Amino acid sequence: MPVIDVQVHPFDRNHPGRPWASPSHGLDSATGEEMVAAMNRVGVDGAIMVSSFSAYEYDPSYALEVYNTYPDKFRVVTPVDATNPAIDDVVAKWAATPGARGIRIRMRDGLPMDADHPGLNRAFAAAAKHGLPVNLLCWGILDKGLPHIQRHRDTVIVIDHLGLLQPARPPVPADVWADLPKLLALAFDPPLCVTAPLPLW
């Protein structure tokens, strides 16, 4: 059975040709070549690349570059902007992109979170229409994500990071497991999935 890492974030070193949108969490790079070497060392056969928002925001071109170099190793999930009036077309175009396997919706201060937000509803619906799972980042605010899960039953939703807040650096949150019972209550509620990456601290 192939071993697949369900969430890696590729990014090149910060340079004028591909500048970062914000500082790295610690690594100078996580290139395709570096990731393939690391995967080979531990017996991982393939990975789902979630384009790094901190490095490239809504631009998945670096992840696609890595996919095009290693099409037998990777598939790509791109962040999408639910405030974009053309979100339906964005998702449709992404679904037709070689290597595309999902979209990511981030929920946090400054971004839409409300269950009645039209852009969010259109993004979830478009993903279902085109057969794309939605990686939903709602860590630390799982209660904000639950209404979307309940509303969009036709969409495969993947809760990133178990829905638990995992800051890039210490200190560890005082009650990091507080929302786990809420997540476990959804365990038998298909088509929900979760990712469980290692904490960064």
Report residues per predicted region.
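Mid-domain alpha/beta scaffold segments of enzyme catalytic cores
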Residues: 1-122, 126, 130, 186
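Catalytic pocket-lining loop regions of alpha/beta-barrel enzymes
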Residues: 114-201
